[in-house]
């Protein structure tokens, strides 16, 4: 309870405070994370996929904080345990293997975090892996290239993986990147807004996915023409989206936010 109250009092107003919050989160997760495992359990809540996939999801979400921290050059006592988990999870000979993905698979969603890690860290990440382990990582992530998935913000997960491959000097598929962007351009509505797929509504995924991943791509890719478009769309979107939240943090309830 003390730790929870301490985190609630963290104003997150500086980089140091954000790092402190991340380390507190990683420390709390570590109590649920056995050594030499490729997943961990955070409870038995219901999802539309198996417990093994949910446990892989739990591990993967922590990487959205850990990989940027590692890219900054800061050390953390938790890095090695996560790197070991990735090696085990992507090794088809390991009992901890994350498995082959299927259509509309939640594991495809989680691959974006690994794409980010490769994009930010490049060979600083792959240096922790043997040649065989790098091949395993590439092969497991590469399942997303031709995967059957919703035509929606999910397209960005495939883009993030290819961006990671490219930045890390691994084989990548530029045609796959172009194809995914073309799909999303088909439901760009103007003024920075997309629908979350053909004929679907506008919702918080426009901010949390389309523009979030779009700005990562614009920053880390060498695709200057597309980066310019993505930045301009984000700028236009922000002029409207700012009114979805009040000064005290209250936001417009919409779709998943009301569940």
Model-assigned labels for residue ranges:
Residues 196-209, 220:
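Hydrophobic, aromatic-lined core segments that form the binding pocket/scaffold
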Residues 258:
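Conserved small/polar residues in nucleotide/adenosyl-binding loops
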Residues 46-128:
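Membrane helical hairpin/interfacial module
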Residues 2-73:
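N-terminal signal-anchor module of multipass membrane proteins
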Residues 20-44, 78-97, 131-149, 173-196, ...:
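Long, well-ordered core segments of solenoidal/helical folds
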Residues 11-15, 69-80, 120-138, 166-182, ...:
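Structural helix-adjacent loops and short alpha-helical linkers that scaffold large soluble proteins
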